[in-house]
């Protein structure tokens, strides 16, 4: 079997002389036309610290591909900075960018008939976007994470970007002055790399390591450390070998691999966004996965790591303590991981973990021992009830009041909600409802980090609940329930809630309930009318037209056949 199984379609034979002529212009020589052509999907950008160091990694990937006997072709893909667009109209483009990234990588790799792809990403949507494309195309591939940022520091306290969001709430509540707010702002993000807690980017990179689509230890490395660049070059070598062996994503991204990823996400206390993204990746890989699967795994996997946003440490601390391989070995020792799942190296998960210790070092407390976990069960709970018949996603660890029944405060946008919080109009016992922020209704399913951080900063984190058909940042914690489906824009019950209604959030019973009679609910449903589309042209209009429910991953290519 030729190594250039796909690309020979454009490099072999007399008829391909014009194709080869153009390839010669970009550096191909006679001997290169039989080598596998490998795309390097480069998400470098200076709009965000998450991606500003990626170009250097892409160059190391190019070197690695060449050394291993492949022919690299570098191309760009996009990124949105979730942190910078947070709380603005621009955030509507964040989840949209996941699918734009997927479509762009698929378009280039298939348009150029590449033999494989090494994708490098940093900010939140880079990871799932790349993996959706990889699963769709089913050509040999590996993902390289751009790396995590190192923590900032102020008055001896580690900072992340979430510290700055929470400082806004503290300032508005009169807890800190403008000088301290400015100091936190200046020190929160000290250099290159993705947001430093177990937020969405680090959650998804950890998931990909657990799935076997990234190299061991690579998901928790700091962006600015030399080992990150070395790991990138090694990834290129591994990919070229995978092309020779024709190890395909369909052999790796299996039901077992995704279950392994979910187990690791629970153990590290990962982001709610992982639920949405793994559903979408599973769909692209033709793997059956539902919200109920997350709940089944959550019930049996403990939270082992003390990581921000609700914990103490950042991802670089996790790396120093033993990283994802140590967490995986602990899960494996307790039969909570599938050891026979294949990885891009050609080895199984079990084989890769053979020499990894099964207990965390005693001189650290980032990774807890099995008999003393942070929490006995996972933190990402699936809630259902008349407010979410398809389901909703809640973070339930670190919540002092796992059951709350309160007065609904209803807002039809994130901005209106944030204004009320900062103005002191939200009281203890309220349940905030933020709707028309779902995949179709936003459109784009914005993250509610600004309101939730303002709640924490105001000292109301364990005193109010917040539910939304939008999403939450990986930096969010507290009594929050997102991904409520069906969403308001399609007539879900969340659209029918009125100011002053009583709502129950019960994490123990996995319940999200609007406390009105079925008859009253049906009356409201009969008079509800859908809103006119907010956007009628451009990418947001297309997205709103195509996107599916968050309960199935908010994918844009469902039901097209």
Curated annotation (Swiss-Prot):
The species this protein was found in: Trichodesmium erythraeum (strain IMS101)
Cite the active-site annotation: 473
User: What UniProt keywords are attached to this protein's entry?
Assistant: 2Fe-2S, Amino-acid biosynthesis, Branched-chain amino acid biosynthesis, Iron, Iron-sulfur, Lyase, Magnesium, Metal-binding
Q: Which reaction does it catalyse?
A: (2R)-2,3-dihydroxy-3-methylbutanoate = 3-methyl-2-oxobutanoate + H2O; (2R,3R)-2,3-dihydroxy-3-methylpentanoate = (S)-3-methyl-2-oxopentanoate + H2O
Instruction: List the EC numbers from the record.
Output: 4.2.1.9
EC class of the enzyme, as a word: lyase
Modified sites of kind N6-carboxylysine: 125
Is Amino-acid biosynthesis among this UniProt entry's keywords? yes
Manner of cofactor binding, per the entry note: Binds 1 [2Fe-2S] cluster per subunit. This cluster acts as a Lewis acid cofactor.
MF (Gene Ontology): 2 iron, 2 sulfur cluster binding; dihydroxy-acid dehydratase activity; magnesium ion binding
Cofactor(s) the protein requires to work: [2Fe-2S] cluster; Mg(2+)
Query: What is the gene called?
Result: ilvD
**PANTHER family assigned to the protein according to its UniProt record, in alphabetical order:** DIHYDROXY-ACID DEHYDRATASE DAD, DIHYDROXY-ACID DEHYDRATASE, MITOCHONDRIAL
**Protein's name according to its UniProt entry:** Dihydroxy-acid dehydratase
Residues noted as binding [2Fe-2S] cluster in the record, renumbered to the chain: 50, 123, 195
Pathway linked to the protein: Amino-acid biosynthesis; L-isoleucine biosynthesis; L-isoleucine from 2-oxobutanoate: step 3/4; Amino-acid biosynthesis; L-valine biosynthesis; L-valine from pyruvate: step 3/4
- Pfam families xref list: ILV_EDD_C, ILVD_EDD_N
Regarding protein family, the annotation reads:
Belongs to the IlvD/Edd family.
* Binding site residues for Mg(2+): 82, 124-125, 447
Q: What is the role of this chain?
A: Functions in the biosynthesis of branched-chain amino acids. Catalyzes the dehydration of (2R,3R)-2,3-dihydroxy-3-methylpentanoate (2,3-dihydroxy-3-methylvalerate) into 2-oxo-3-methylpentanoate (2-oxo-3-methylvalerate) and of (2R)-2,3-dihydroxy-3-methylbutanoate (2,3-dihydroxyisovalerate) into 2-oxo-3-methylbutanoate (2-oxoisovalerate), the penultimate precursor to L-isoleucine and L-valine, respectively.
Q: Subunit structure, per the record? A: Homodimer.
| Gene Ontology process terms (BP) | isoleucine biosynthetic process; L-valine biosynthetic process
């Amino acid at each position: 079997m030729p190594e250039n199984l796909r690309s020979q379609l454009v490099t072999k034979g007399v008829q391909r002389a014009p194709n080869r002529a153009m390839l010669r212009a970009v550096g191909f020589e006679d001997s290169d036309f039989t080598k596998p052509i490998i795309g390097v999907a480069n998400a470098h950008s200076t709009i965000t610290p998450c991606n500003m160091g990626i170009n250097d990694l892409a160059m190391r990937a190019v070197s690695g591909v060449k050394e291993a006997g492949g022919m690299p072709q570098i191309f760009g893909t996009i990124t949105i900075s979730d942190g910078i667009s947070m709380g603005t109209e621009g955030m509507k483009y964040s989840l949209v960018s996941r699918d734009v990234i997927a479509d762009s990588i698929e378009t280039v790799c298939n348009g150029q008939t590449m033999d494989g792809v090494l994708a490098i990403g940093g900010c939140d949507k880079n990871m799932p976007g790349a993996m959706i494309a990889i699963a769709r195309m089913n050509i040999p591939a590996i993902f390289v994470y751009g790396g995590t940022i190192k923590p900032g520091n102020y008055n001896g306290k580690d900072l992340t970007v979430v510290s700055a969001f929470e400082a806004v709430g503290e300032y508005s509540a009169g807890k800190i002055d403008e000088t301290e707010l400015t100091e936190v702002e200046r020190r929160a993000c000290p250099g290159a790399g993705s947001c430093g807690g177990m937020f969405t980017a680090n959650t998804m990179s950890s998931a990909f390591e657990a799935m076997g689509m990234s190299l061991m230890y690579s998901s928790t490395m700091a962006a600015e450390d030399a080992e990150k660049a070395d790991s990138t070059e090694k990834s290129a070598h591994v990919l070229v070998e995978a092309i020779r062996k024709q190890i395909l994503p369909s052999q790796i991204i299996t039901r077992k691999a995704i279950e392994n990823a979910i187990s690791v996400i629970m153990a590290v206390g990962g982001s709610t966004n992982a639920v949405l993204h793994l559903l979408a990746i599973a769909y692209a890989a033709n793997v059956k996965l539902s919200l109920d699967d997350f709940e089944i795994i959550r019930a049996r996997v403990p939270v082992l790591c003390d990581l921000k946003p609700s914990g103490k440490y950042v991802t670089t601390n996790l790396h120093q303590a033993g990283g994802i391989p140590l967490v995986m070995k602990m899960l494996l020792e307790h039969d909570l991981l599938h050891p026979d799942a294949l990885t891009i190296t050609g080895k199984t998960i079990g084989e890769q973990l053979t020499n990894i210790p099964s207990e965390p070092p005693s001189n650290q407390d980032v990774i807890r021992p099995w008999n003393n976990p942070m929490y006995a069960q996972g933190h990402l709970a699936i809630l259902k009830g008349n407010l979410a018949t398809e389901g909703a996603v809640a973070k339930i660890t670190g919540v002092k009041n796992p059951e709350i029944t309160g007065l609904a405060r209803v807002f039809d946008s994130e901005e209106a909600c944030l204004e009320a919080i900062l103005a002191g109009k939200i009281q203890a016992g309220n349940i905030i409802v933020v709707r028309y922020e779902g995949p179709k209704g936003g459109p784009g399913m914005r993250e509610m980090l600004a309101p939730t951080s303002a709640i924490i900063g105001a000292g109301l984190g364990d005193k109010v609940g917040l539910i939304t058909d939008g999403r939450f940042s990986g930096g969010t914690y507290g009594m929050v329930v997102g991904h409520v489906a069906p969403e308001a824009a399609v007539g879900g019950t969340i659209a029918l809630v009125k100011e002053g209604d009583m709502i129950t959030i019960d994490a123990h019973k996995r319940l999200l309930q609007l406390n009105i009679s079925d008859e009253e609910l049906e009356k409201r449903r009969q008079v509800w009318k859908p809103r006119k589309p907010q956007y009628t042209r451009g990418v947001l209009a297309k997205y709103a037209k195509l996107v599916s429910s968050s309960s199935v991953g908010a994918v844009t290519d469902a039901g097209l056949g």
